[in-house]
Amino acid sequence: MSEETQYEYLVPLEKYLSAGVRLGTRLSNKYLEERGFIYAVRPDGLRIFDIKKIDERLRIAAKFISRYQPDRILVHTTRPYGFKPVQMFCKFVGCRALTGRFIPGTLTNPYLPNYTEIDLLFVVDPKLDAQAVAEAAKMGIPIIALVDTDTPHQYIDFMIPCNNKGRRSLALIFWILARQVLRERGELKPDQDLPVPPEEFETRLIQ
């Protein structure tokens, strides 16, 4: 039996595949390549992530997040497909959600009405969420980020390699993380799932 067969994923491998979690872009970050996150390159140039490494990083990220007070964690995204996953994650985990525009000074200017003091920042895309990343770095706040194959890694303390652009991918990633954080905190049993399926974390398409 191969090591790949023996490894027990957080969700069935087919779920990762059908959600497109491992699909990257045609651009590649050498930093990610050197760390073995990028598994292969398709004939059309699309980079493919190593699903096992995604799974391993999700486990570690959940342990890391579970050590913080929920209300001292800010999860931010400016990507519309990330709005619902982030809001659902924060609903279950108890942390703060900031979707849409990040007002400059939110983490650095105490005179702003929306000034927020946090101990951990979690962003969906460091490229799009660059303002939040820059402010957290300036304040010495640890940063967790979902990173695609073309994502800059500067200032990121912990990276979760994955497709951070797809609607279904983001839903599954945040569903897994929410479940794992609650398991780590003892609020769910080790084999217990969330009361809603990953589809409930998906941003709905307007017909």
Swiss-Prot record:
Annotated GO molecular function terms are:
structural constituent of ribosome
Q: Which Pfam families match?
A: Ribosomal_S2 (PF00318)
What Gene Ontology cellular-component terms does the record carry? small ribosomal subunit
Q: Which UniProt keywords apply?
A: Ribonucleoprotein, Ribosomal protein
Which InterPro entries does the annotation name?
Answer: Ribosomal_uS2 (IPR001865), Ribosomal_uS2_arc (IPR023454), Ribosomal_uS2_euk/arc (IPR005707), Ribosomal_uS2_flav_dom_sf (IPR023591)
GO BP: translation
SUPFAM superfamilies membership: Ribosomal protein S2
**Per the similarity annotation, which family is this?**
Belongs to the universal ribosomal protein uS2 family.
Name recorded for this polypeptide: Small ribosomal subunit protein uS2
| Organism, as annotated | Pyrobaculum islandicum (strain DSM 4184 / JCM 9189 / GEO3)
- Gene this chain is encoded by: rps2
